[in-house]
Swiss-Prot record:
Source species: Saccharomyces cerevisiae (strain ATCC 204508 / S288c)
Gene Ontology cellular-component terms listed: chromosome, telomeric region; cytoplasm; histone acetyltransferase complex; nucleus
Enzyme Commission designation: 2.3.1.48
Gene3D superfamilies: 1.10.10.390, 3.40.630.30, Histone acetyl transferase 1 (HAT1), N-terminal domain (3.90.360.10)
Gene transcribed to yield this protein: HAT1
Entry function: Catalytic component of the histone acetylase B (HAT-B) complex. Acetylates 'Lys-12' of free histone H4 in the cytoplasm. The complex is also found in the nucleus, however it is not certain that it modifies histone H4 when packaged in chromatin. Histone H4 'Lys-12' acetylation is required for telomeric silencing. Has intrinsic substrate specificity that modifies lysine in recognition sequence GXGKXG. Involved in DNA double-strand break repair.
Protein name: Histone acetyltransferase type B catalytic subunit
A single GO molecular function term of this UniProt record: histone acetyltransferase activity
Keyword set, alphabetical order: Acyltransferase, Chromatin regulator, Cytoplasm, DNA damage, DNA repair, Nucleus, Phosphoprotein, Transferase
Amino acid sequence: MSANDFKPETWTSSANEALRVSIVGENAVQFSPLFTYPIYGDSEKIYGYKDLIIHLAFDSVTFKPYVNVKYSAKLGDDNIVDVEKKLLSFLPKDDVIVRDEAKWVDCFAEERKTHNLSDVFEKVSEYSLNGEEFVVYKSSLVDDFARRMHRRVQIFSLLFIEAANYIDETDPSWQIYWLLNKKTKELIGFVTTYKYWHYLGAKSFDEDIDKKFRAKISQFLIFPPYQNKGHGSCLYEAIIQSWLEDKSITEITVEDPNEAFDDLRDRNDIQRLRKLGYDAVFQKHSDLSDEFLESSRKSLKLEERQFNRLVEMLLLLNNSPSFELKVKNRLYIKNYDALDQTDPEKAREALQNSFILVKDDYRRIIESINKSQG
C-alpha cells in the first residue's frame, strides 16, 4: 500500500465521470451523463473504489442494455455502495446482460431480426434530414413491446433531464413518441406525453359528447449522438402538428421545460405562426382586440403564457410601437404586489430592467431563427 491509498480522494470517484454510456451501432459512441444523482445520490460521488469505470451500453436499434463495472481495488467495508446493484435497480429486470459482452451482442443481433416498430406502433409522420429519412411513431404503454422499449430507454430521462422521474406505465393516459432512422432502424430519441381531461365549463360539458383534453409534453430527449442536427425541431413539430389535427385536444402544454427546450419551443412556435400569416397581421395591426387574440390562442391550442410570449416576439420582430407597453403591462400585473410596496421611482427602474431582460432574450431567440435560416 502506498501513502495515497490512505487518502479519501483515492477511493472517491465522480459518478458522472465514472459512468460511461454508449450507444452501439456500426460504431460505438460513448458519452457521459449530465446527472447521476437519482442513482448515486445528491453528491454524485461514489466512495470505496479505485479507478472505477461503469460501462452502460445499449444497442442502437433495440436498446438492449449491457452493464460492466470495472475497478482496480475496492475497500472491504460493508457500507460501501454496490455500484452495479444500484445501477441495475434502475434498469429492466431480467433484460440486462451483465459483464458477458459476447452474450449481449448475440442477444441484440437475434432480436434485431424481428424488431420492427412499424409493425406495432402508429406512424405519425416522416421527414428528410441531411439525405436520410426519419420516421415518427407513437404508442401507448398498453402494448408489451412498447413497455419493453420504454423500460430500456427510460434511464436516459434520469441521466439527461434534470428532476426527471420514471412515469407510471400503468396509467393509460401516457403516450410515447418514437423517432427512428427509416433505413437503419436506429432509435434517435423519444418523448413521453400525457393527456388530461380539459373542463371547458358547464355549458360545454353538457353539450359535448366527446371529451376534450390538454396534451402535455413531459420528457423530450434526442440521444446525445444525434443532438444538434435538427432532429429536436422535426420531432417537436411532428408532435405538435398531430395534436393540432386532433379535435379532442384543446390545449398544448409542456411540463417544466429547461432553457434549451424553451428555446426550441419558441423558435418552432414563432416560425409556425409566421407561416400561418400572423407575422403579416401584426405588421398591419399592432393593436389587436382581446377577442381576436383569445380566438387565435384557442385555434393554435397554445397555453396563455406561451401565446403571450409569442405575441410579444412578433411585435418586436415588426418593430411595433406597442411592444414595450404590452411587455411592461404584463410584467407590472405579474409583479404587482412587489412593485406596489416599492418606492415609485425604484419600481419604474425595476420594471425597466425587467423589460430590457425580456427584450434581449427575445432578440436572442429571433437572431437564432434568422441564423438557422440564413
